[in-house]
UniProtKB/Swiss-Prot annotation:
InterPro entries: UPF0145_dom_sf (IPR035439), UPF0145_YbjQ-like (IPR002765). It holds the Pfam family YbjQ_1. It comes from the Bacteria. Gene3D superfamilies: Hypothetical protein apc22750. Chain B. This is UPF0145 protein CHY_0465. Belongs to the UPF0145 family.
Length: 107
């Protein structure tokens, strides 16, 4: 499955537009991770714990979106957008949206 943020792919033509596909994930945080993140914020470092959680959530939503596109008969998803939101005090939501398409190489 080819995934792209752009609306077109060089060397390919879209032969079928199959619809909008999404992937969603809501991840909970925990006390220890929050504590470590706040310490990193105070001393100006990066929060590896949160970065790892963001990467995990991003992988989940992209895989979920790919599976939904595959069920529609797509071999690519174009125009992908990723959104990140905090939900309440201790939850992180990641949403991926794109267009499922069937592509073929240009001749």
């Amino acid at each position: 499955m080819l995934l792209a943020t752009s609306g077109r792919l060089d060397g390919f033509k879209v032969t079928k537009y199959l619809g909008i596909v999404t992937g969603e994930a809501i991840m909970g945080t925990n006390f220890i991770r929050d504590l470590l993140a706040s310490i990193s914020d105070i001393i100006g470092g990066r929060s590896g714990a949160y970065e790892q959680q963001l990467e995990e959530a991003r992988n989940i939503v992209l895989n979920e979106m790919s599976e939904r596109a595959k069920r529609l008969g797509a071999n690519a998803v174009i125009g992908i957008s990723l959104d990140y939101e905090s939900v309440g005090q201790s939850m992180l939501m990641v949403v991926a949206t794109g267009t499922a398409v069937y592509i073929e190489p240009e001749m």
